[in-house]
Amino acid sequence: MKTSAIDHVVLTVPDVERTVAWWHDELGLEVLRLDEWRRGEALFVSLRVSADTLIDVLAGERTGENVNHIALVVDGVDLDELAASGRFEVEMGPADLFGARGTGRGIYIKDPDGNRVELRTYPS
């Protein structure tokens, strides 16, 4: 397995509208799925950093763990097989999930310090 990119980072924030406005107004990031989020059709709003990287903004109270997870694009691995292998304790998935390049396959695992890491693949 080879890691090739950071797909997205998820921030948990108490005021999504304020956070999205700041990242857009101050840093010029493109806002994605805001209207869908407002209608309850999307769990989070996304901010485009680059063609391949997003910051997702998830509503939630500050708990000291305000970075929800880091998502890494991985190549050369079947996530269904990896999840079944027992190599990692899988917190969620495999599942088809929205990301910087559209829908891909992902699993959530934890690093030794308890940080949530998503391993993500995309169709070729």
What are these regions (language model features)?
Residues 38-43, 64-66, 100-105:
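Short acidic/glycine-enriched loop/turn segments that link adjacent beta-strands
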Residues 62, 123-124:
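A short acidic/small-residue loop/turn micro-motif
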Residues 1-18, 67-70:
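N-terminal beta-strand motif that seeds the catalytic metal site of vicinal oxygen chelate
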Residues 60, 64, 68-73:
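Helix-adjacent hinge/juxtasegments
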Residues 16, 70-116, 123:
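Vicinal oxygen chelate
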Residues 11-54:
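Core segments of cupin and vicinal oxygen chelate
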Residues 55-58, 118:
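Conserved beta-strand in the GNAT
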Residues 30-37, 95-98, 124:
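Conserved catalytic-core motifs of GNAT/GCN5-like acyltransferases
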